[in-house]
Design a protein with these regions (language model features):
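Active-site cores that bind ATP or allylic diphosphates and position pyrophosphate for catalysis
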Residues: 103, 107-236, 242-248, 281
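N-terminal Rossmann-like or analogous alpha/beta NTP/dinucleotide-binding catalytic cores
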Residues: 2-120, 216-229
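Short acidic, gly/pro-rich beta-turn/loop elements at beta-sheet edges
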Residues: 21, 55, 161-163, 244, ...
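Residues that cap or initiate secondary-structure elements
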Residues: 17, 51, 157-159, 188, ...
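General helical structural elements
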Residues: 16, 31, 119, 130-133, ...
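Glycine- and acidic
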Residues: 11-17, 45-49, 202-207, 255, ...
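Conserved nucleotide- and phosphate/pyrophosphate-binding catalytic cores
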Residues: 57, 61, 70-71, 80, ...
Length: 517
């Protein structure tokens, strides 16, 4: 059904700047880039901004930013269709002169009446070519009189057939097509006119786009031919569905690249996940580097069936990248989330009293990154290592305050930690267990409140690793703060939501049992 491409290509990604870059659009861009990278050629970025009412310059910038963030590199562009309006009008005049297009003076009211009549008959509306037979003299007179008109393409007779890279052989009968509009009454181009003119001028050889454009292709092929252009090879990707198996929408959660970026997903993970959402590289591996994906990519392994956007699977994949990326690659993506916590790596934090210690930051990241799912969670669990004070969950303070002997036990532990010659995890564990034994309590009676004191959470990595990384000064400061909170629990306790979201970051998720899309 499909075919392999082995020669250099010219592909394009052509979003409309009417909103944030959707994950479906990002996946289309990824497949175009992978094809270009795998066989050579050029990747063209084109902004289809001829819809004056809905297009937004800010969205044009945002789309470019989102593409760059996810790691997509284009070779040419961005080209703006709004800067090529004269070219579309010029090509429209050529079609009129060649008899491949004609002026239509039918009013919207007339067309609506015809559409209603067709609906009443239970038929799909096709423009009845009312104006096709007008002679040149009448057309000239009506144009001279200032009567509004559109320019319609004269569709050829017969079926339109083509081979789709994803779907195989396609056949559209003539009764499914009509003479569509090329230029509106204000001379602005429709999508059909601008996209075909651009693909010809930009020498596009392969058009890989969403299946929502499949019905446009039988219109575009004869237009390519009428304009003297080489018809590109087409491939139409299936839609991405939500968990309800309906078209992915806001009700399914974040659907734009920008939203997922803000939630703490890494670009490497999102690229990897979207690439596998409709493409099967073969084998069982799901974590693939960009180099590996380029080497493995082939359009004959693109799936024609819709893929379901599985947020759980994306979250798992993100956790794998959080665990494995070199810190030099990870830290630039983490910095904005540290800033949200009042901490700025390399420039000090809101209450850190100076620059963040790079060694402690690196150690804290290493300790926690295998236990979190997103950059947001990682920043939340790293923040206590650099804060002067933490907000403790009110229920934890209430529980600790109910134990009349706990404050004394913690105070004794605090003094022993302060006098330790070597502040290592082995020495810390030995000292805590010694204090517990001397005071006739179990070690757990000290471990749980100590963890809360230092992290604001009751879950996390091994406690003594945490204390060693945090260091003597910060650890003693947090123990002092918890002791102060126990003396005045009502005044010092904060709502549970004020602390780090440790419950969401306590354990790495297992990979869900689902296909690669």
């Amino acid at each position: 059904m499909s075919q392999t491409i082995s020669t250099p290509v010219r592909v394009r990604f052509a979003p409309s700047p009417t909103g944030f870059l959707h994950v479906g659009g990002a996946r289309t861009a990824i497949y175009n880039e992978l094809l270009r990278q795998s066989v050579g050629g050029a990747f063209v970025l084109r902004i289809e901004d001829t819809d004056r009412e809905r297009s937004d310059e800010a969205m044009t910038r945002q789309i470019q930013s989102a593409l760059a963030w996810i790691g997509i590199v284009w070779d040419e562009g961005p080209f703006l269709q709004s800067e090529r309006l004269a070219r579309y009008r010029e090509r429209g005049e050529e079609l009129l002169a060649a008899g491949r297009a004609y002026r239509c003076f039918c009013t919207p009211a007339q067309l609506e009446e015809q559409r209603a009549a067709a609906q009443k008959r239970g038929q799909a509306f096709r423009y009845p070519r009312t104006c096709l037979g007008l002679d040149a003299a009448e057309v000239g007179a009506r144009v001279a009189a200032g009567e509004p008109f559109v320019v319609r393409f004269r569709m050829p007779d017969g079926d339109i057939r083509f081979h789709d890279l994803v779907r195989g052989e396609m056949d559209f009968p003539p009764d499914a097509l009509d003479d569509f509009i090329l230029l509106r009454s204000d001379s602005s181009p429709t999508y059909h006119m601008s996209v075909v003119c651009d693909d010809i001028d930009m020498r596009i050889t392969h058009v890989i786009r969403g299946e929502d454009h499949l019905s446009n292709t039988p219109k575009h092929i004869p237009l390519f031919q009428a304009l003297g252009g080489e018809v590109p090879v087409f491939g139409h990707l299936p839609l991405i569905l939500g968990p309800d198996r309906k078209r992915l929408s806001k009700r399914s959660g974040a659907t734009s690249v920008e939203e997922l970026r803000a939630e703490g997903f890494l670009p490497q993970a999102l690229y990897n996940y979207l690439a596998l959402l409709g493409w099967n590289p073969g084998g069982d591996r799901e974590i693939l580097s960009r180099v590996e994906m380029i080497a493995l990519f082939s359009v004959d392994r693109l799936n024609a069936s819709p893929a379901v956007f599985d947020r759980e699977k994306l979250t798992w994949m993100n956790s794998q990248y959080l665990s494995s990326l070199p810190q030099a690659e990870l830290l630039p993506h983490l910095r904005p989330f540290l800033a949200e916590q009042g901490l700025a790596a390399g420039t000090g934090g809101a209450d850190a009293g100076g620059d963040l210690d790079p060694a402690r930051l690196a150690a804290a990241i290493e300790l926690h990154r295998g236990r979190v799912h997103t950059l947001e969670e990682l920043a939340q669990v790293v923040a206590p290592y650099f804060r002067d004070r933490l907000d403790y969950p009110s229920e934890a303070i209430a529980k600790f305050a109910a134990d009349p002997g706990l404050a004394g036990h913690l105070a004794a532990l605090r003094e022993r930690f302060a006098s330790l010659p070597a502040f290592t995890k082995e020495a810390l564990e030995a000292e805590l267990r010694a204090v517990a034994g001397e005071r006739g309590i179990k070690a757990g009676a000290l471990i749980h409140p100590t963890r809360t004191a230092l992290s604001g959470s009751q879950a996390g990595p091994p406690l003594f690793d945490l204390i060693e990384v945090m260091g003597r000064e910060a650890s003693l400061r947090h123990l002092d703060h918890l002791l102060e909170s126990l003396r005045e629990p009502a005044a010092a306790a904060a709502p549970a939501a004020g602390g780090p979201k440790a419950s969401n970051a306590a354990a790495k998720p297992e990979p869900p049992h689902s296909s690669q899309g």
